[in-house]
UniProtKB/Swiss-Prot annotation:
Family: Belongs to the CbiQ family.
Recorded GO CC terms: ATP-binding cassette (ABC) transporter complex
Complex and partners: Forms an energy-coupling factor (ECF) transporter complex composed of an ATP-binding protein (A component, CbiO), a transmembrane protein (T component, CbiQ) and 2 possible substrate-capture proteins (S components, CbiM and CbiN) of unknown stoichimetry. Expression of just CbiMN in E.coli confers some cobalt uptake.
Membrane topology: Multi-pass membrane protein
Gene Ontology biological process terms from the UniProt entry: cobalamin biosynthetic process; cobalt ion transport
Pfam families documented for this protein: CbiQ
Organism phylogeny: Bacteria, Pseudomonadati, Pseudomonadota, Gammaproteobacteria, Enterobacterales
Species annotation: Salmonella typhimurium (strain LT2 / SGSC1412 / ATCC 700720)
Biochemical pathway: Cofactor biosynthesis; adenosylcobalamin biosynthesis
Protein's name according to its UniProt entry: Cobalt transport protein CbiQ
InterPro entries: ABC/ECF_trnsptr_transmembrane, Cobalt_transport_CbiQ, ECF_CbiQ
Length: 225
């Protein structure tokens, strides 16, 4: 069980109907797109406080979860701020590179500010939904939304194999660590290469075991969701 999945089961709203959670998330997303940057910042603070209270976690831990997508968002915002132009008077600040100027424009700063707060608020709302929606409730929500059965089964299998992959990786790395496989940088690279090779082999073996189990149970191509 991953950290996010474990948190979703300890949420104060773990047993609240998934439809209500989805509707609340939808309202959060609509507000994230229609509010001005100041309103988006206020919504972000409300979502952060609600997430910490529901999940019984500290604000620091929530910020660490948000730091993962924040890095990608920051790179995107930086690319919006900077522009290339032949007319330096259009730039607030810039440097010349041959016949071109690279710098910051007023429109770029405004767009970057709006994009930053809108995206960060939408990300926090989506993270709230993920951390408060256990996987069985997600499957139930997909069924109620009449998502094609094949797609739902694919999501279920992908989720299962994700856990298999993580379990095998943790077991192999623990065994390598006990044998001082990561005591130095060269040994670490060597152990990492061995982990990748063993992981591929063991996941294939687990897949074959699951296929055999399904055949024994007279699997006809449909999972009972």
């Amino acid at each position: 069980m991953t950290g996010l999945d474990r948190l979703s089961y300890q949420s104060r709203w773990a047993h609240v109907a998934p439809q209500r959670k989805f509707l609340l998330w939808l309202a959060m997303m609509i507000l994230a797109f229609v509010l001005p940057p100041v309103g988006q910042g206020i919504e972000l603070l409300i979502i952060a406080g609600l997430s910490c209270w529901l999940l019984r976690i500290s604000l620091w831990r929530w910020c660490r979860w948000m730091a993962i997508p924040f890095g990608f968002l920051l790179v995107g915002v930086i690319t919006i701020i900077f522009s290339i132009s032949r007319e330096p008077q259009m730039l607030l600040a810039g440097i010349s590179v041959g016949p071109y100027w690279i710098g910051i424009t007023r429109a770029g700063v405004v767009t970057a500010n709006e994009t930053f707060w809108r995206s960060l608020t939408a990300l926090s709302a989506t993270l709230w939904l993920v951390m408060n929606l256990p996987f069985p409730q997600l499957i139930s929500l997909l069924k109620r939304a009449h998502i094609p059965r094949l797609l739902t089964e694919q999501i279920l299998l992908t989720w299962r194999f994700l856990f298999i992959l993580l379990d095998e990786a943790v077991a192999i790395r623990r065994a390598q660590t006990l044998r001082f496989g990561y005591c130095s940088l060269p040994n670490g690279y060597r152990s990492l290469a061995m982990l990748a090779g063993l992981l591929f082999t063991r996941v294939l073996m687990r897949y074959q075991q699951m296929t055999t189990t399904l055949d024994i149970k007279l699997y006809q191509g449909d999972f009972h969701l």
